[in-house]
A protein has these predicted regions:
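N-terminal pre-domain/capping segments
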Residues: 1-94, 98, 126, 133
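Active-site acidic/histidine proton-transfer and metal-coordination neighborhood
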Residues: 72-153
Length: 153
């Protein structure tokens, strides 16, 4: 069995770049990072190299989702922001040599608009998969229960 540790959730008592060494010390060969975008690519590459780790997954930027907002991937009025997030994600994904990019659908607080949000998400997911496939990067999306994240699609 192969396991990857999520450095966004584990070793949170340590500064982010020190978590790579902790993961290696605990026997991990692979890591995932939810949102690496606050850390320069070169710093992450160095931490991976120094600790002989592979980054296997990152999330596509999700806008305000983690702060309680709707996010980006499914919001009809945020297609330009989503496109910009795709560009940033692709740069990180290629540089870090990840094999998977996770897209968080987001929230819809208006049940009457849910069908439009799902349609937007489907279109964005297809665009994302088409953009990442030439680099052998798999696009995934995550289902989150609505008790932990109300109104999640």
């Amino acid at each position: 069995m192969k396991l990857a540790v999520n450095l966004s959730l584990m070793y949170t008592e340590l500064p982010f770049l020190e978590r790579f060494a902790a993961a290696r010390k605990d026997g991990f060969n692979a890591v995932e990072i939810q949102f690496p975008y606050d850390t320069p690519i070169l710093d992450i590459q160095q931490a991976l190299r120094e600790n002989n780790l592979q980054c296997v997954l990152i999330n596509l930027p999700a806008g305000d989702l983690m702060q309680g907002g709707e996010g980006l991937a499914a919001v009809p009025g945020k297609t330009a922001e989503y496109a910009a997030a795709m560009v940033e994600c692709l740069a990180y994904a290629r540089a870090l040599k990840v094999s998977c990019v996770n897209v968080l659908p987001g929230r819809c607080t208006d049940e009457n608009k849910r069908v439009f949000y799902l349609d937007t998400f489907k279109k964005n997911l297809v665009k994302t998969a088409d953009s990442l496939a030439p680099f052998n990067i798999t696009t995934t999306f995550e289902a989150i229960n609505t008790r932990d994240m109300p109104d999640f699609l």
